[in-house]
């Protein structure tokens, strides 16, 4: 069986953010403070049309022998897929206190109010409204070991509205939780070369988890998970190795599990690495060449309800190599060529109840002009 559909819609978004920042003296030391506020509004309206069959399913025969051709089915009339009016306003403040020459304390808080008026998926005659608000404090302590090295610890509260729906077509409650982080940072040669190493732990409730089942409208059904814990480590190195040669390297490793020890979001890689470099030719300074590789480990999804019952879709670890060259024709005008997926690696960019192939080898050329 195959699944298809037409979608159309529009999104309009407006946002404003304003803040004041300044310094002040207290107890003979210089400190900093900031106050601000923001408001955003987003309006979405989407319709869809499907083949006139159950959930848009069309018989394509044996998919192993299918060549991609199929007769144009009878399409259903356009109907409402989703219609939302989302407003979010916030007020925030932060301060950086100099406790001693090497020691700084950072304190802050944000108040957020989130309001959404929407139609449950596939229910054009039902209008719902939900308003949530929360205060999210954060704090950090930074200690300068010497001119090059510093260490820090931080705490942040989490309040994150979601755009996923449950089986009734209602939006899930915002994700809430706490985040803890500690690390070291260093910079050398007047910040020409920087590096950082951090460990983190994130505790969350109301985390959206895809059930890989669908509403009659075709929209995915999600459920909320409580007691989700993510913990891991990050490393990054950025800088200029010479006047003409720049390098970036980063690596992340983490695990995420629910309160029962089950993997959460297993369709996202647990280990990632990136290496990117660029070089400006000394004999032809207008030309810059570079490239890099992005690598990730295996991802998978367990799906219920298939012809064979429970099944697993997975993508093994892989790396993608990309190249670029940029020529500065004039001070304002430049031309750039990009080669993505240099070795034409075949891979799945998404794994779930279906899979989506990643982009094959492709080349693009662009021009830019700075005024």
Locate the predicted segments by residue.
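Face-selective signature of the C-terminal outer-membrane beta-barrel domain
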Residues: 2-119
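Membrane-embedded beta-barrel scaffold of Gram-negative outer-membrane proteins
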Residues: 144, 151-152, 175-240, 247-252
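Transmembrane beta-strands of outer-membrane beta-barrel pores
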Residues: 37-43, 111-115, 155-161, 188, ...
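Hydrophobic, lipid-facing positions within transmembrane beta-strands of outer-membrane proteins
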Residues: 12-18, 87-93, 135-141, 168, ...
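Conserved C-terminal beta-signal and adjacent last beta-strands/turns
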Residues: 9, 33, 180, 266-371
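Residue-level signature of outer-membrane beta-barrel architecture
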Residues: 22-25, 97-98, 133, 141-144, ...
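Repeated loop/turn-to-beta-strand initiation elements of outer-membrane beta-barrel proteins
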Residues: 28, 102-105, 147-151, 190-195, ...
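Gram-negative outer-membrane beta-barrel transporters
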Residues: 101, 201, 223-304, 343-346
């Amino acid at each position: 069986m195959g699944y298809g559909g037409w979608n159309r819609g529009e999104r309009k978004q407006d946002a404003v953010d304003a803040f004041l920042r300044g310094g002040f003296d207290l107890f003979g030391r210089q400190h900093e403070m900031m106050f601000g506020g923001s408001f955003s509004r987003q309006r979405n309206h989407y319709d869809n049309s499907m083949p006139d069959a159950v959930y848009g399913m069309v018989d394509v025969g044996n998919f192993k022998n299918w060549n991609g051709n199929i007769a144009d089915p009878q399409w259903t009339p356009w109907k409402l897929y989703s219609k939302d009016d989302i407003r979010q306003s916030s007020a925030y403040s932060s301060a950086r206190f100099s406790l001693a020459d090497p020691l700084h304390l950072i304190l802050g808080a944000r108040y957020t109010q989130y309001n959404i008026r929407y139609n449950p998926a596939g229910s054009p005659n039902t209008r719902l409204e939900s308003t949530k608000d929360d205060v999210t404090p954060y704090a950090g302590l930074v200690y300068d070991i010497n001119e090059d090295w510093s260490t820090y610890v931080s705490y942040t509260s989490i309040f994150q509205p979601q755009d996923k729906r449950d089986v009734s077509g209602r939006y899930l409650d915002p994700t809430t939780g706490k985040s803890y982080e500690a690390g070291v940072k260093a910079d050398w040669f007047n910040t020409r070369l920087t590096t950082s190493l951090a460990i983190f732990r994130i505790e969350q409730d109301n985390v959206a988890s895809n059930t890989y089942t669908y509403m009659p409208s075709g929209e995915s059904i999600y459920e909320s998970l409580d007691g989700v814990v993510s913990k891991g480590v990050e490393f990054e190195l950025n800088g200029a190795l010479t006047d003409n040669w720049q390098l970036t390297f980063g690596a992340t490793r983490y695990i995420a599990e629910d309160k029962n020890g089950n993997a959460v979001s297993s369709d996202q890689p647990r280990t990632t690495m990136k290496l990117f470099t660029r070089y400006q030719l000394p004999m032809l300074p207008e030309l810059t060449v570079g490239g890099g590789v992005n690598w990730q480990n295996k991802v998978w999804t367990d799906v219920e309800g298939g012809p064979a019952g429970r099944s697993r879709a997975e993508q093994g670890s892989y790396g993608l190599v990309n190249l670029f060259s940029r020529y500065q024709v004039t001070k304002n005008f430049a031309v750039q060529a990009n080669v993505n997926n240099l070795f034409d690696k075949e891979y799945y960019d998404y794994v779930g109840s279906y899979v989506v192939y990643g982009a094959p080898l492709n080349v693009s050329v662009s021009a830019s002009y700075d005024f």
